[in-house]
């Protein structure tokens, strides 16, 4: 068990066993544990539920700190905000906390659809929820948001996809492959049988450097945004922020999420026809790319938005790029809150 993945660092959360989970790749998890953090309470008819899935490396604590609060669009005094940690992130069932044949490198290949299926079971059987006022997520959370809206069109009343696409691009697939190789080519990785996460420090450091290169935009560094965050040089930013962020994480967990991220694609439901898949969506949908995102570009997001009925394109302006999702740009968060508040006040489908 990796001591990083504890309530002390990421809590509080509740571990909920939803039972066996058949996976799209053919295996079955004998029991699937979902780490869930709830903010606010359900109203009498349970019509105020909002689902927030997590992104690559992120946990429910980050979602709470960055996006949830009284006076914000995601206001726990008005809504019951249910944050579900994705499978493989270290809090929910993952390579680092599962025994038997699923331990470590034996952990199953999990798809975005498996997360959404598990979340649907959680919401319907544990919470007794029959619809969601909103599903909102960033990056891999956006991938899950799209999967929800396509797979369960009558369940989702509103959807907000932030900095993510419904079908991953070939360019992004390749970049994620390089993230994977940064870890797996470390000799200490030992095919996933490393003695501890810290033993794979060199691989995790390379992984962090790649995230620095693509996660933040060139403009972020050229204009000195890293200095505004307290780092006098790019190297200090890499060492003091990015390497420090990823260093305690379990490599096998990161690989589980990266494999899943690469294969996000709602068109699996329609034989590869993306327009047909997105045409299923009934939810009032806001598509919100980040202007300087190098992973999920504005153009990629716009081309998908045009295929979604009852959708609007609401790009977020931030030179921070994809990792503006970390909440480093207060003006971007203001834009996001305004869009989400507008979406929540609009009629459902």
Curated annotation (Swiss-Prot):
Protein name: Ethyl acetate hydrolase
Domain notes: The 3D structure excludes the ability of the enzyme to bind homoserine and acetyl-CoA, indicating that it cannot function as a homoserine acetyltransferase.
PANTHER family given in the database record: HOMOSERINE ACETYLTRANSFERASE FAMILY PROTEIN (AFU_ORTHOLOGUE AFUA_1G15350), HOMOSERINE O-ACETYLTRANSFERASE
Disruption phenotype: Inactivation of the gene abolishes growth on 2-butanone and 2-hexanol. Mutant accumulates ethyl acetate.
Family the entry assigns: Belongs to the AB hydrolase superfamily. Acetyl esterase family.
Matching Gene3D superfamilies: alpha/beta hydrolase
Domain AB hydrolase-1 intervals: 67-300
Subunit structure: Homodimer.
Catalysis performed (reactions): ethyl acetate + H2O = ethanol + acetate + H(+)
Source taxon at top rank: Bacteria
Alphabetically ordered keywords of this record: Hydrolase
Enzyme Commission number(s) from the entry: 3.1.1.113
UniProt entry tagged with the keyword Hydrolase: yes
Matches recorded under InterPro entries: AB_hydrolase_1, AB_hydrolase_fold, HAT_MetX-like
One biological process term in Gene Ontology: biosynthetic process
A molecular-function term among this protein's GO annotations: acyltransferase activity, transferring groups other than amino-acyl groups
Annotated catalytic residues: 139 (nucleophile), 293, 322
Functional description taken from the UniProt entry: Esterase that catalyzes the hydrolysis of ethyl acetate. Involved in the degradation of short chain methyl ketones (MEK) such as 2-butanone and 2-hexanone. In vitro, can also hydrolyze vinyl acetate, 4-nitrophenyl acetate, methyl acetate, propyl acetate, benzyl acetate and methyl propionate. The highest activities are obtained with acetic acid esters, but the alcohol group also plays an important role, as compounds with two carbon atoms in the alcohol moiety, i.e., vinyl and ethyl acetate, are by far the preferred substrates.
